Amino acid sequence: MSELDQLRQEAEQLKNQIRDARKACADATLSQITNNIDPVGRIQMRTRRTLRGHLAKIYAMHWGTDSRLLVSASQDGKLIIWDSYTTNKVHAIPLRSSWVMTCAYAPSGNYVACGGLDNICSIYNLKTREGNVRVSRELAGHTGYLSCCRFLDDNQIVTSSGDTTCALWDIETGQQTTTFTGHTGDVMSLSLAPDTRLFVSGACDASAKLWDVREGMCRQTFTGHESDINAICFFPNGNAFATGSDDATCRLFDLRADQELMTYSHDNIICGITSVSFSKSGRLLLAGYDDFNCNVWDALKADRAGVLAGHDDRVSCLGVTDDGMAVATGSWDSFLKIWN
């Protein structure tokens, strides 16, 4: 037996020991604990607005912190800022690269960011003196596509990439201040903790990792999915997070228990998940699927509580407003829909 095989065997044994140790600590399951809680009942949401304006597949969307404005990115090479109350377009920003995969709204509302197959995170200033929107920074440093980005504040942004890394950037200098390495596959998604000191990432190595923003180190690694993790989202209290994967399941992982608490799946759901988001209370988990639907799960009981059906193609992105009053879904059918 070669040294490599021996090491592989040892690693496998260690993994099993860790799994057994975790099992020994888990004295109850979430299902048992939540058994006597009333089910949420049937969730029926209606489409309140349809945002029309993109001419091709929508790949990403992100709400502003005011719960009114949102940004969307499409294959048509446009970044559009929408007023969800009136359905008006506040800005339509032409992009240098139409191969965009992600977009983000800064908490201040002053900036938006986007990126994709150009490997660059482009920052746009919405509040210039002249009133026009222009590129204020292009953050180049990743050697693979940009899959996700999220602002910490007006001068810091975290990005994830197909080069298997995540990075923290100083926008003013345009430099990576921290690189987060450890995944062995393309990093597909990231989510900031409510206090922005930590973030989680999901990758094509089927694992999720918890990172310390300031120290640049991986705190925890979570396994369980059988295929690529496409989407990840923190639980509102910051103690857990949900993932969505090509294995047709969503899962809930707890930071303190250091393991998976729940799987959200159904025999007749056989397609991958593209996006996940929690309701404001955390009781509902919304997930967008390749089969054109968005399923609403009871996060505590893993029952399907509702379906948002209204798109004619894959639901590629979704988001719940900060005030918890509305959900937006974006699709390859080129439309965004606002539900509540």
Curated annotation (Swiss-Prot):
Keywords: Acetylation, Phosphoprotein, Repeat, Transducer, WD repeat. Phosphorylation at His-266 by NDKB contributes to G protein activation by increasing the high energetic phosphate transfer onto GDP. It comes from the Eukaryota. The modification Phosphohistidine is found at residue 266. GO terms for biological process: signal transduction. The keyword Ribonucleoprotein does not apply. WD repeats lie at residues 46-94, 95-140, 141-181, 182-223, 224-267, 268-309, 310-340. The modification N-acetylserine is found at residue 2. The modification Phosphoserine is found at residue 2. It holds the Pfam family WD40_Gbeta. CDD domains: WD40. InterPro entries: G-protein_beta_WD-40_rep (IPR020472), Gprotein_B (IPR001632), Guanine_nucleotide-bd_bsu (IPR016346), WD40/YVTN_repeat-like_dom_sf (IPR015943), WD40_repeat_CS (IPR019775), WD40_repeat_dom_sf (IPR036322), WD40_rpt (IPR001680). G proteins are composed of 3 units, alpha, beta and gamma. The heterodimer formed by GNB1 and GNG2 interacts with ARHGEF5. The heterodimer formed by GNB1 and GNG2 interacts with GRK2. Forms a complex with GNAO1 and GNG3. Interacts with ARHGEF18 and RASD2. Forms complexes with TAS2R14 and G-proteins; these complexes play a role in the perception of bitterness. Component of the TAS2R14-GNAI1 complex, consisting of TAS2R14, GNAI1, GNB1 and GNG2. Component of the TAS2R14-GNAT3 complex, consisting of TAS2R14, GNAT3, GNB1 and GNG2. Belongs to the WD repeat G protein beta family. Guanine nucleotide-binding proteins (G proteins) are involved as a modulator or transducer in various transmembrane signaling systems. The beta and gamma chains are required for the GTPase activity, for replacement of GDP by GTP, and for G protein-effector interaction. This is Guanine nucleotide-binding protein G(I)/G(S)/G(T) subunit beta-1. It comes from Pongo abelii (Sumatran orangutan). The gene is GNB1.
